[in-house]
């Protein structure tokens, strides 16, 4: 007990010592070693950097914050099963504040780990609704309530209010193992904003999107999913709200919009 940083450093490298101090939650010592030139990306035998370790424990939030401020790589990748980036690890453990910290600091939410899962996939599997909505709101081109029409077309013409249902939808980029590949968009449909598992995912790059007739009082967007041969008809959450439908149509066409979450 009471060892100075100098005496401890003689026994191990500064880089490894920084890792150990991060685990211990010693923020001041981590800052001191950083100022002395310690490398932030030292990797332990399991492939974890100091930031990855800090993102696995809610008690190390301040350590994670300092490491990021000092320049730690928020997208450091740990190979192997159940691994990935700091964001994957924070999501897996349900650390909502750490997830928000990473996203606001430039963490890439579209990276897939060796299990071919994005951080959003992990959040859905874990059933964490707050983190699912947080990630979607960060990466989305559009998100919000909509109406979905269903049933025979002739019935909708007579009583559309009886053949529509409220849904929660998001237009988001598909995850990728290669950040250099062009983004492909998906329209994700949930029964409600409290559901973590999508009811439907439409690959928009493999769909026909028909521009709404905005001259109609209550226009609708028609999407035909080529892969499932299914047609979807969507309208704004509030009847006659053409602006929201404009946002949805533009988002499906690849133009980012304001995310309403």
What spans do the regions from the language model cover?
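Ankyrin-repeat C-terminal turn/loop position
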Residues: 38, 72, 106-108, 140
């Amino acid at each position: 007990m009471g060892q100075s940083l100098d005496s401890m450093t003689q026994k191990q490298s500064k880089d490894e010592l920084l890792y150990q101090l991060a685990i211990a939650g010693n923020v001041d010592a981590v800052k001191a070693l950083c100022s002395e030139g310690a490398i932030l990306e030292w990797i332990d035998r399991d492939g974890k950097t100091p930031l990855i370790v800090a993102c696995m424990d809610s008690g190390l939030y301040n350590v994670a914050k300092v490491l990021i401020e000092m320049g730690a790589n928020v997208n450091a990748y740990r190979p192997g099963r159940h691994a990935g980036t700091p964001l994957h690890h924070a999501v897996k453990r349900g650390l909502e504040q750490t997830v928000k910290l990473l996203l606001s600091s430039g963490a890439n939410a579209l990276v897939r780990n060796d299990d071919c899962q994005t951080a959003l996939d992990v959040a859905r599997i874990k059933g964490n609704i707050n983190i699912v909505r947080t990630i979607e709101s960060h990466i989305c081109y559009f998100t919000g309530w909509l109406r979905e029409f269903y049933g025979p077309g002739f019935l909708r013409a007579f009583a559309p209010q009886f053949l529509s249902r409220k849904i929660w939808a998001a237009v988001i980029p598909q995850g990728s193992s290669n950040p250099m590949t062009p983004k492909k968009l998906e329209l994700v449909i949930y029964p409600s904003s409290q559901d973590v598992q999508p009811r439907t995912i439409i690959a928009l790059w493999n769909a026909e999107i028909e521009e709404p007739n905005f001259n109609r009082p209550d226009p609708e967007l028609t999407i035909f999913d080529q892969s499932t041969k299914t047609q979807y008809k969507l309208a704004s959450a509030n009847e006659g709200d053409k602006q929201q439908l404009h946002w949805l149509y533009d988002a499906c066409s690849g133009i980012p919009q304001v995310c309403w979450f």
